[in-house]
Every structure is written in structure tokens, then in C-alpha cells.
Design a protein with these regions (language model features):
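Short, Lys/Arg-rich nucleic-acid/phosphate-binding segment
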Residues: 64-70
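Interfacial catalytic loop of ABC nucleotide-binding domains
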Residues: 9
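C-terminal regulatory/oligomerization modules of transcriptional regulators
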Residues: 1-6, 25-39, 44, 56-61, ...
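Short, hydrophobic-biased segments on the C-terminal half of alpha helices
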Residues: 51-52
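Pre-recognition alpha-helix immediately N-terminal to the DNA-recognition helix
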Residues: 20-22
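Short helix-coil-helix linker/hinge
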Residues: 13-18
Length: 113
């Protein structure tokens, strides 16, 4: 049951830290699974399983390049995450505005001393 949720939901897929690290590595460009596995300190089959999950939710694309398969980031798959976190933008903007006002008040108080 958990397997189905992981492969159909981008939030579940990126909940796994090693999958997020794979996405970070792929921001620099497409790479073969062996290179990703070595970078992450995991087995090639383990990296392949993570890549399969990421591919199934639309975060990774693969293409054949000679004898190897290259995996690349498809950031369009992060749209649901972006849209969901965007709902908190107002909260963060207001928080940063209050922090900025506080810092300005501190600066002004120091100048008056």
C-alpha cells in the first residue's frame, strides 16, 4: 500500500532524503546512475530504485546515451510542491516585514544613544 502512494505522489517521493539529494545532484545536469550511486555512497541498484520512484512521479527523465542511460531533472514535476508552499508566502512575507521593522527600530535606537 505505501509503495503505491510513494510512486504516485510527489510529496511522498521527495519525503525520502536520498531522493532529495538525487534531485540536488541532477540540478547540475544529467548523470548516469553509477555516478549518482557513487556520489551518494549507495549501491547502483539502490540508486536505480530511487530514480525509478522519481521518474514515476515526473521528477526525473532518462535518455539513452551510448551504452548508458542518463538521468536528468524535470523540475516541472515539482509544480504541486511549489503551488502548495506558495500558500504560505503571505505568512513568510509578513514575518520578514516584521523582522525588517524590528531591525530598523534597533538601528534607530542605537543611533539615538
Amino acid at each position: 500500500m505505501a509503495r503505491a502512494a510513494t510512486t504516485s505522489d510527489v510529496f511522498n517521493a521527495i519525503a525520502e532524503p536520498q531522493r532529495r539529494e538525487i534531485l540536488v545532484l541532477l540540478r547540475a545536469g544529467a548523470r548516469p546512475v553509477t555516478e549518482l550511486a557513487q556520489e551518494l555512497g549507495m549501491s547502483q541498484p539502490g540508486a536505480s530504485k530511487h530514480l525509478r520512484v522519481l521518474r514515476e512521479v515526473g521528477l526525473v527523465r532518462d535518455r539513452k546515451a551510448g551504452k548508458q542511460r542518463l538521468y536528468g531533472l524535470d523540475a516541472r514535476g515539482l509544480r504541486p510542491v511549489h503551488e502548495w508552499t506558495g500558500g504560505f508566502e503571505r505568512f513568510w512575507n509578513e514575518s520578514f516585514d516584521r523582522l525588517d521593522e524590528y531591525v530598523q527600530d534597533l538601528k534607530q535606537a542605537r543611533q539615538e544613544d
